[in-house]
């Protein structure tokens, strides 16, 4: 305000000065004119005064008119200049005012912390974090665009702050929703991955079980072929019905029972076996093994508790895996029921035997009779259940269960015990029916073979011996058949015999042989003994010959894969090495030539080549025109899977090459049944350091020999 007032005072002073000067000028002009006129005309003084006053009045009026004209011009100029000033400066003024408002709002809205951060502690390194930033250029731009000043007030800033915080809350909420959705998605993916892994693991377990199942069948076939039968092999043979002419005549569950064979029958049986061996002239090994397996089955003396537990595990495995047909499932389910029953009875008998041997009282629970089943009623129960088919037993079970549910059964405990016995009788009836069906199929197959051109010849002596002894043993055990087939734990007579045997003498009981037995001629017995020895020697020779004539086990692919894994991936400069560099050695006669058939070992070799950048090559070659490659090392993998003496590792030797001094021969020697093998390699000095790649090991039937050549550096 002071500057504007001072300017106005200066302008008014200048205007007054100009007016005074103009008035003084007019007076001087009038004075000169009067003086001139007085000289010329010389009017009277009064008239001159009047004229002077009128002229002064006229000049004053004209000067006032001139001054008014000049003042009007100055006012119009001032008005136009003030108009120009408002157009230029209003924007600057408004922007400054808006900036002041924004600064005032920022100062008023200043806080101590922003989102938990302060000026002293924040991860951004900003010491003015709590102060609101005023963007002056943006405010000027907004004012130019016509934004009202109310938008820069404290109220507007608070409103914008609320909108920003609302948007921040929305962003936080969306972020939390995305995090929850991401966590849920990751959980679902992890669940899917676990399900996939569980399914893969289940498939692996299933494949592993199938593999073990196949291996168990292979082992069973080997034991059957070699005459080392186990109970599970007999049960599998009952179900499968092998292609040979041998088949089991007894029911499958008879593997659990104890056979009683007299000593005389056993001796007669041994003599008959010897005669069959002589008749076969030790040529038909399959007949001998077949006879031995039949002997093992006919003279089976029952299973121990440990054998039954092992048999139960085998049956359980077959029940889980051998489910190709409903008949197989029924067969193994019935066998598991019979096995559980027999295992429980065997454990019961063992407990009684242990108590009897120790002189202790048997446990009360073992001596107690089954509730509702008196010993005198056992025969009636056996008579009720024996001889019925599986369907009849199922119908009887349904009838008893309906009576128990309706309450019409008079003796509930008795019928419950009968139901318990029904399970084992149903299982045995099912096994009988399946076995009968297998026998019918076998007979049908025999009839077809007899009608065909390729009839299978069976040794008549073998058939006669087996049939006669089976009939004799069956006649002997006919009286004990009911006891053997009955599910009753221990018969009273058997217990009495065992008690008498334990309490009395342990001398063998005198057994009378059959009247048809003949005396043994010493000469004939000696001949038979020599014949048996010849059979054993012939078997050994035949087995050795088959082993030598047989082809090596098909493990070459696996050995090659192992060698490739040991050598690693092929690098630049590696190449397959062997067939062209193999040296044909002179034929040799080894000391083991008469025992084993010599064979050449398989191999899988590599040669490593590369560039040697010495001073000469660096001078005359570059990477675009490289020097010729040179051999830098070898990797030998010689396969000896069938080595007789696996303890003694194969060796290698370096020999001179008569054709060239730049090459030499490396010979590999292992022993029977492999011949020596040699290769022609570059004659250079080797690196024997393991850090430089040297390796010489013999493991898992593979001889690994890896080496590189030394690199000689030029030194002054």
From Swiss-Prot:
One of its GO terms (biological process) is mRNA splicing, via spliceosome. Disruption phenotype: Embryo lethality when homozygous. It is found in: Nucleus speckle. Pfam families: Cactin_mid (PF10312), CactinC_cactus (PF09732). Disulfide bonds: none annotated. Residues 10-22, 81-95 have a biased composition (Basic and acidic residues). Signal peptide: none annotated. Residues 153-201 form a coiled coil. Residues 46-61 have a biased composition (Basic residues). Residues 468-500 have a biased composition (Acidic residues). Keywords: Coiled coil, mRNA processing, mRNA splicing, Nucleus, Phosphoprotein, Spliceosome. GO terms for cellular component: nuclear speck; nucleus; spliceosomal complex. Residues 1-104, 466-525 are annotated as: Disordered. Interacts with At5g63440. PANTHER family: POLYGLUTAMINE BINDING PROTEIN 1/MARVEL MEMBRANE-ASSOCIATING DOMAIN CONTAINING 3 (PTHR21737), SPLICING FACTOR CACTIN (PTHR21737:SF4). Plays a role in pre-mRNA splicing by facilitating excision of a subset of introns. Required for embryogenesis. Belongs to the CACTIN family. This is Splicing factor Cactin. It comes from Arabidopsis thaliana (Mouse-ear cress).
